[in-house]
Swiss-Prot record:
SMART domains assigned: AAA
Keyword Nucleotide-binding carried by entry: yes
This protein's name: Probable ATP-dependent transporter ycf16
InterPro entries: AAA+_ATPase, ABC_transporter-like_ATP-bd, ABC_transporter-like_CS, FeS-cluster_ATPase_SufC, P-loop_NTPase
Origin superkingdom: Eukaryota
Amino acid sequence: MSTEKTKILEVKNLKAQVDGTEILKGVNLTINSGEIHAIMGPNGSGKSTFSKILAGHPAYQVTGGEILFKNKNLLELEPEERARAGVFLAFQYPIEIAGVSNIDFLRLAYNNRRKEEGLTELDPLTFYSIVKEKLNVVKMDPHFLNRNVNEGFSGGEKKRNEILQMALLNPSLAILDETDSGLDIDALRIVAEGVNQLSNKENSIILITHYQRLLDYIVPDYIHVMQNGRILKTGGAELAKELEIKGYDWLNELEMVKK
């Protein structure tokens, strides 16, 4: 039996700017199916910019390079098309949507994905039976389904709601942008357990984080350290421990060597 992995994402010399300021200065990254990659780096290094560009945020302009998602040019797709194709972004600060119940929002997103796959839409009752199972992944009470999207949710509840969306949509590529930000240890553990349950040999996950503590619960296959819009170093899980001890200052010397 072949164990060859499928290439999910290939980023080649990606350059990007926002409001005329260059942020990404040549990012290269390859991710295969079944892999978890963590991107770490100091504030302002370009980590969150990279995640938003993958999702198609209109404020960021790609000025060079290419992004291939399952061998297709991701940059040619609108944000909604990327989502339907299997790219999922969990925001650092999930937005609130007044007047839209969580279950209606989730069913719309789920049925849009089904349509993309040529499947029929699910009626509310059938969908409820599916989403009820997924609630167990993130230990959420069913009453959250009837509340407006993220409205009045705590920070931990918002992050768990994002992972619930991920569980339903089963994306090929999930990008978790500082999902650990603002979480206490119990909420972090619940979110991490949910992510670990959803990780499988068919999908890929990018964890973007500033701190090592998330990686105590979700062990990545690769860690990439970003500084000044470039990936300067790649290693295994041990690299996060090195960063915890050394901090990020040593990257300045490494960057000088690579220039």
